[in-house]
Amino acid sequence: MEQIIVHGGNTKLEGTVKIEGAKNAVLPILAATLLAEEGVTTLKNVPILSDVFTMNQVIKHLNVAIDFDEDANEVTIDATQPLGIEANYEYVSKMRASIVVMGPLLARNGHAKVAMPGGCAIGKRPIDLHLKGFQALGAKIIQKNGYIEAIADELIGNTIYLDFPSVGATQNIMMAAVRAKGTTIIENVAREPEIVDLANILNKMGANVIGAGTETMRIEGVDKLHAVEHSIVQDRIEAGTFMVAAAMTEGNVLIEEAISEHNRPLISKLTEMGAIIEEEENGIRVIGPKHLKPTDVKTMPHPGFPTDMQAQMTAIQMFAEGTSIVTETVFENRYQHLEEMRRMNADLKIDGNIAVINGGNELQGAAVEATDLRAAAALILVGLRANGITRVSNLKYLDRGYYEFHKKLQKLGANVERVNDEKIEEKQATTVI
């Protein structure tokens, strides 16, 4: 077991931090490379994350040659050989996003079999919208023994309305529809920047996708797609996490290559709290205030406030001088991190999907456990300002979405370290709290 140990109290982050390629963009784009029947695809700006390694293994076991050059942050994929139809259970069960291989496999093979996905324990997150989309394109769906199968002799374009703008469903249906005969119109689609990035690579590959980033997408089916070179868009959630870190520590941090247009709701909320946000030529600078003001947040599908920034916002709200209200509308069961923050003397109440955070308490370091990916980052952020030592465990979640998070914080001046069991025992024997 590993832990991140945070020595908090008077941390002020200063300097420059580099943002990686987006986890939420690279995973569906890796799946999209299965559609390339000609050539070798090269993906650049690929983040070194455990989820990326998992997706690489899912793809490899479909009879695809894949190589990850970690030094160059590049992945090459040769999917020109006949593909398998079944995604490997060992890897699919670890990560929910692996369900997005289903659309490309259905489009390419006319047959896809995928185990029910795993991942972070954030609510139910059903995949019924994915399956309804496949059915609308002419696929037969079979659910049996923990597996889902989609079978179609031919996919036919159709008009599909999503009851909710699900990111995963939008991606899966897009990738199936690019090979469907005729025109597919998808209404009430997800509009996240990662959707636009997926559409960009699909169009480079020879697809005809119109309207990505808007509420309605139109896709004209094509017969074949080919390999391309593509650079993954920057990670707006990692950028947002460091923006919050700077703001809550009275810091002064330049987040390199962060795209302000992708973080408008967060910028608005941090400004309300007193932070100064400056757009510079090579990124976004965040200067934290001496006194943080409270602010209310309601998560929404893009372009609303992102649910993936909710935990980090609760971290900064703990130190605001007043009461903040958070309303989570995207996922249920996404306040588990708040129970861990209570261990640090946080004053809060949870009522269904609403959390009331009374800021201004003196928070104390404690041993806490990450309950999901963003919770892991949020607990570390609270530790930066809490008095004493905070120990954050269950780092498998952190590694799914952040590359060397502790090292980036160290570079900005934080007193944090990542230690293994042996070093933990040594420190516990010598440290008085």
Swiss-Prot record:
Coiled coil: none
GO terms, molecular function: UDP-N-acetylglucosamine 1-carboxyvinyltransferase activity
NCBIfam families linked to this entry: murA (TIGR01072), PRK09369.1 (NF006873)
Alphabetically ordered keywords of this record: Cell cycle, Cell division, Cell shape, Cell wall biogenesis/degradation, Cytoplasm, Peptidoglycan synthesis, Pyruvate, Transferase
Family: Belongs to the EPSP synthase family. MurA subfamily.
Main enzyme class: transferase
Species annotation: Enterococcus faecalis (strain ATCC 700802 / V583)
Binding site for UDP-N-acetyl-alpha-D-glucosamine: R96, R125, P126, I127, D128, L129, D308, V330
UniProt-listed PANTHER family: UDP-N-ACETYLGLUCOSAMINE 1-CARBOXYVINYLTRANSFERASE
Gene name as annotated: murA2
Reaction equation(s) it catalyzes: phosphoenolpyruvate + UDP-N-acetyl-alpha-D-glucosamine = UDP-N-acetyl-3-O-(1-carboxyvinyl)-alpha-D-glucosamine + phosphate
Protein name: UDP-N-acetylglucosamine 1-carboxyvinyltransferase 2
Major localisation: cytoplasm
Gene Ontology CC terms: cytoplasm
Keyword Iron-sulfur: no
GO biological process: cell division; cell wall organization; peptidoglycan biosynthetic process; regulation of cell shape; UDP-N-acetylgalactosamine biosynthetic process
